[in-house]
From Swiss-Prot:
The family this protein is said to belong to: Belongs to the melanin-concentrating hormone family.
Gene label: PMCHL2
InterPro entries xref list: Prepro-melanin_conc_hormone
Region annotated NGE-like, chain positions: 31-49
Tissue-by-tissue expression: Expressed in testis but not in brain.
GO terms of biological process kind: chemical synaptic transmission; negative regulation of synaptic transmission, dopaminergic
UniProt protein name: Putative pro-MCH-like protein 2
Residue runs in coiled coils: none
Length: 86
């Protein structure tokens, strides 16, 4: 059997400080340190509400063709061809 000193010596987590003092969990951080963009999230939600309340009947509707989608995909970099080859 190992003595108490040997057990403590081989315990990697026992360095004189308790584990909860060494590592502070992410959710224990307070204020803007934990969630720096928290205010930005509220602004985004209000912007989305403003956009959704637009008048659907008066909005312009344009026909979108296959070539338009191909050009858009090219601009977003999701295809392996040059934009002028679309």
């Amino acid at each position: 059997m190992l003595s108490q000193k040997t057990k403590k010596k081989h315990n990697f987590l026992n360095h004189g400080l308790s584990l909860n003092l060494v590592i502070k969990p992410y959710l224990a951080l307070e204020g803007s340190v934990a969630f720096p963009a928290e205010n930005g999230v509220q602004d985004t939600e209000s912007t989305l509400e403003k956009r959704e309340t637009g008048d659907e009947e008066n909005s312009a509707k344009f026909p979108i063709g296959r070539r338009d989608f191909d050009t858009l995909r090219c601009m977003l970099g999701r295809v392996y061809q040059r934009c002028w080859q679309v």
